[in-house]
């Protein structure tokens, strides 16, 4: 078996493993933390929502973090078999075959895959799940927040500056709330992480006043670590609905795919 992996172990590939080598590697990889791709000559049996069998042939197996399983043949875009989640996985070898069994508890489903040869096994570990948005750019989101703070942030804020330069960088929005407090807003179009919190903290620290300054991080989601850091720094988080922000910013637009969601 030829095996290559990154120094930190986040991704790698094993080429032409024996059945025993493939089993040993998959027992380590199928722990729910890696995206695993297996290519080889395999057959499958499924029982659950219905029942199906695919005979031995070229197959591509994808196992995602969290247990989603997808089995593809060489043609078309529809999978031969799939399961949305897995409760338990078994890896075994017998009679020259590598056997993988993926069990789902509720509703009960079992997907069994038997491979006579493996061409390669590839894997990658994702430390943080990203997000895919098609609604708007970050500039659009910042404009929507500036124009519609009541609808998106839940309070009236009068903004008087955008992308104001500070020693820590450009702060997205500066404003004043209903009580006269200075408000600094950092906008993120994707899930906010700890670096976004530190950005906002720097902007608040840089503001030249002894009065109270509120720092608000605006994003569609926030990681647990970022939320803990945010709260420890006395900052605030507002969850924003991107679809709502888009509709507020584009009230006169023609019909788009969003109208059918």
Swiss-Prot record:
The answer, when asked if Phosphoprotein is one of the entry's keywords, is no
A GO cellular component annotation here is: cytoplasm
Say where the protein is mainly found: cytoplasm
List the CDD domains hit by this protein, alphabetically.
Answer: NucS-like
Give the top-rank taxon of the lineage listed in the UniProt record for this protein. Answer: Archaea
One of the record's GO molecular function terms: DNA binding
- The answer to whether UniProt assigns keyword Hydrolase to this entry is yes
Keywords (A to Z) from UniProt: Cytoplasm, DNA-binding, Endonuclease, Hydrolase, Nuclease
Q: Where in the cell is it found?
A: Cytoplasm
- What EC identifiers does the entry list? 3.1.-.-
The record ties this protein, via Pfam families, to: NucS_C, NucS_N
Family from the record = Belongs to the NucS endonuclease family.
Question: What is its biological role?
Answer: Cleaves both 3' and 5' ssDNA extremities of branched DNA structures.
Q: What is this protein called?
A: Endonuclease NucS
Source species: Aeropyrum pernix (strain ATCC 700893 / DSM 11879 / JCM 9820 / NBRC 100138 / K1)
